Amino acid sequence: MTVPTPRHGTPHGGLPGRTVLITGATSGIGRAAALAIARQGARVVLVGRDPERLRTVTNEVARTAGPAPDAFRADFAELRQVRELGERLRDRYPRIDVMAGNAGGMFWSRTTTQDGFEATLQVNHLAGFLLARLLRERLAGGRLILTSSDAYTQGRIDPDDLNGDRHRYSAGQAYGTSKQANIMTATEAARRWPDVLTVSYHPGEVRTRIGRGTVASTYFRFNPFLRSAAKGADTLVWLAAAPAEELTTGGYYSDRRLSPVSGPTADAGLAAKLWEASAAAVGDTAR
């Protein structure tokens, strides 16, 4: 599907003066993207969970690109905080040109949030899905960019069992399922929201803080063969700034190239069912 005529945030490329919202902005890909996008002249809006790291990145962006960015604290493991965040953002910004849904994590043992959802699914998919829907009117004519991963091939999406209660827990599979959900959400959003250019992307294997507090964190933080956060953020930054006519709404990108998806992830009917199940899960009846 090619993009329709609305502006989509940056019709001719570039970001000067645009409002760019980045979740998961306090470390890794989100931090790197915030710095790069601010350097292009955008008004960056940061969202993060940890107040100290949020202050640190706010100061880094200010030193790099001038005025301090706006910053909002929210823990995506609590949907109440996501709803409150949505209200604050709607009150503050009449338009959001780009929303980069980048918040994420991996939980090595099964964890249930106070909302009753498996934590990986909620933090990586449901919370961002809810926030995008809350900001739907502000995103009109803009872009929605969802961080995914080629780990989606390990996912097992079941709209009738979002929590995966029917299967033994696997951290890798839960992570893959959440990333699979983001690709499918982008596909379905492109169908339902034709005035929003919606894409997902694979950042590559990146050195990040994911898995902190576990043995695996050593792999993700210090493996010299993994990409830097800046390299991982490159496709996100490009998707935010590229001319709209160069992009395909609903597409999945890797290294600035459109990449085909396979298996159930490519099933449009399943994507529609996932959308409805996710909306029911977060208690949001808006279309």
From Swiss-Prot:
Q: What does this protein do?
A: Could reduce the 13-carbonyl of daunorubicin to produce (13S)-13-dihydrodaunorubicin. Could also be able to reduce the 13-carbonyl of doxorubicin.
Name the positions where NADP(+) binds: G24, A25, T26, S27, G28, I29, G30
Record-annotated residues binding substrate? S149
Q: Which UniProt keywords apply?
A: NAD, NADP, Oxidoreductase
Q: Which InterPro entries match?
A: NAD(P)-bd_dom_sf (IPR036291), SDR_fam (IPR002347)
Which residues does the entry assign to the active site, renumbered to this chain? Y175 (proton acceptor)
Quote the EC number.
Answer: 1.1.1.-
Per the UniProt record, the source organism is Streptomyces sp. (strain C5)
Tell me if NAD is a UniProt keyword of this record: yes
Cite the GO molecular-function annotations of the record. oxidoreductase activity, acting on the CH-OH group of donors, NAD or NADP as acceptor
The name of this protein is Putative daunorubicin C-13 ketoreductase DnrU
Which family does the record claim for this protein?
Answer: Belongs to the short-chain dehydrogenases/reductases (SDR) family.
